[in-house]
Amino acid sequence: MWTPSRRQLCLAFLLVCVLSAGSFFFHLNGGNFFRNGLTLSVLCSDYHLLKSPVAMVCLPHPLQTSNGSPSCPEQSSSLSGTWTITPGGRFGNQMGQYATLLALAQLNGRQAFIQPEMHAALAPVFRISLPVLDPEVDSLTPWQHLVLHDWMSEEYSHLEDPFLKLSGFPCSWTFFHHLREQIRREFTLHNHLREGAQYLLSGLRIGPAGIRPHTFVGVHVRRGDYLEVMPNRWKGVVGDRAYLQQAMDWFRARHKDPIFVVTSNGMKWCLENIDTSHGDVVFAGNGQEGTPGKDFALLTQCNHTIMTIGTFGFWAAYLAGGDTVYLANFTLPDSEFLKIFRPEAAFLPEWVGINADLSPLQAQFDPWKPDSLFRLV
């Protein structure tokens, strides 16, 4: 008669224990595995990249640090469905898309996922937490599509589609301001960017006497393609020399020993047009649009902000806090831009607007000018 050895008995006992534990775990959590089909996915920690075919995968941060937070938050059992947004535009645009997706998904009880392209744009700069949508799942999901306009509407509070792909270029505080602290956490700089910006700022001095500044004012001057787009497409202007002078004087009148830290994608123009006679202006940005992290970090580590136009300046001001001066009324009243842009939804009520000088545009589009009459004929 065969008698099992002690080793065989131990192995059999261990096998029974494993099967029992697995059965208990399945019955305890099994409903959670398949409740939402494609929406419920295997989520990975920040330092794991799963190789097996799973519904959703979190990509690792390209700049993983010991103090980095996980990119995949614990998923709330109250959230269902799968929402995402089509990334588009540049750095500030994608920040607006990220924040709007997060806010609308929470408002409607849905789980938000970002596209790999958005993760690649934002994760090198911020410790973002939204998980990343696997491309294969993206291609198989029966999406409903919604193009967002750039202000919060009541209809966005009652969106019932469980699989929704948003699009557009939302960047209005009306979507996410009620979650301001959460948004600030999402857009927390990686330590090396924050510390690098603070190191640069700590070494700045005012004038020949080397006065240590009491107040740091970040200045973002948007130029680049806007020099053509604003006047030719939108009947608008960008911030000019006179506007920047007024904005700086506004801060000089209200803050002791301010220093102005200028960043721009048109630094040559800034060097030639910004008045440096007070000895309180520093041209610190590198203007590299492909790697915006350093310029953005500098702006957000300042106490206050001067912005011209654009989402990059908006986000710098929003995250820096403090006082913000912005360029107001920068288009003609009949501009098509005002059909997609509402100033009251773009700028916080406490921010200070300085009206743009529209006289060059008014002369250009004056219907009674001889060349305008010639065009009409």
From Swiss-Prot:
Disulfide bonds: none annotated. Residues 27-377 are lumenal. GO terms for biological process: cellular response to glucagon stimulus; cellular response to glucose stimulus; cellular response to low-density lipoprotein particle stimulus; cellular response to xenobiotic stimulus; endoplasmic reticulum unfolded protein response; endothelial cell apoptotic process; fucosylation; lipid metabolic process. The keyword Membrane applies. It is a single-pass type II membrane protein. The keyword Lyase does not apply. Disruption phenotype: Homozygous mutant knockout mice for Fut1 develop normally, exhibit no gross phenotypic abnormalities and the Fucalpha(1-->2)Galbeta epitope is absent from the epithelia of the epididymis mice. Pathway: Protein modification; protein glycosylation. It catalyses: a beta-D-galactosyl-(1->4)-N-acetyl-beta-D-glucosaminyl derivative + GDP-beta-L-fucose = an alpha-L-Fuc-(1->2)-beta-D-Gal-(1->4)-beta-D-GlcNAc derivative + GDP + H(+); a ganglioside GA1 + GDP-beta-L-fucose = a ganglioside Fuc-GA1 + GDP + H(+); a beta-D-Gal-(1->3)-beta-D-GlcNAc-(1->3)-beta-D-Gal-(1->4)-beta-D-Glc-(1<->1')-Cer(d18:1(4E)) + GDP-beta-L-fucose = alpha-L-fucosyl-(1->2)- beta-D-galactosyl-(1->3)-N-acetyl-beta-D-glucosaminyl-(1->3)-beta-D-galactosyl-(1->4)-beta-D-glucosyl-(1<->1')-N-acylsphing-4-enine + GDP + H(+); a neolactoside nLc4Cer(d18:1(4E)) + GDP-beta-L-fucose = a neolactoside IV(2)-alpha-Fuc-nLc4Cer(d18:1(4E)) + GDP + H(+). The chain crosses the membrane at residues 9-26. Glycans are attached at residues 67, 303, 329. CDD domains: Fut1_Fut2_like. It holds the Pfam family Glyco_transf_11. Its EC number is 2.4.1.69, 2.4.1.344. Keywords: Glycoprotein, Glycosyltransferase, Golgi apparatus, Lipid metabolism, Membrane, Signal-anchor, Transferase, Transmembrane, Transmembrane helix. It is found in: Golgi apparatus, Golgi stack membrane. In the adult, highly expressed in pancreas, testis and epididymis and to a lesser extent in thymus, lung, stomach, small intestine, colon, spleen and uterus. Not expressed in brain, heart, skeletal muscle, kidney, liver and bone marrow. Expressed in epididymis and testis. GO terms for cellular component: extracellular space; Golgi apparatus; Golgi cisterna membrane. GO terms for molecular function: alpha-(1,2)-fucosyltransferase activity; fucosyltransferase activity; galactoside 2-alpha-L-fucosyltransferase activity. Residues 1-8 are cytoplasmic. Belongs to the glycosyltransferase 11 family. In mouse, there are three genes (Fut1, Fut2 and Sec1) which encode galactoside 2-L-fucosyltransferase. Catalyzes the transfer of L-fucose, from a guanosine diphosphate-beta-L-fucose, to the terminal galactose residue of glycoconjugates through an alpha(1,2) linkage leading to H antigen synthesis that is an intermediate substrate in the synthesis of ABO blood group antigens. H antigen is essential for maturation of the glomerular layer of the main olfactory bulb, in cell migration and early cell-cell contacts during tumor associated angiogenesis. Preferentially fucosylates soluble lactose and to a lesser extent, fucosylates glycolipids gangliosides GA1 and GM1a. This is Galactoside alpha-(1,2)-fucosyltransferase 1. It comes from Mus musculus (Mouse). The gene is Fut1.
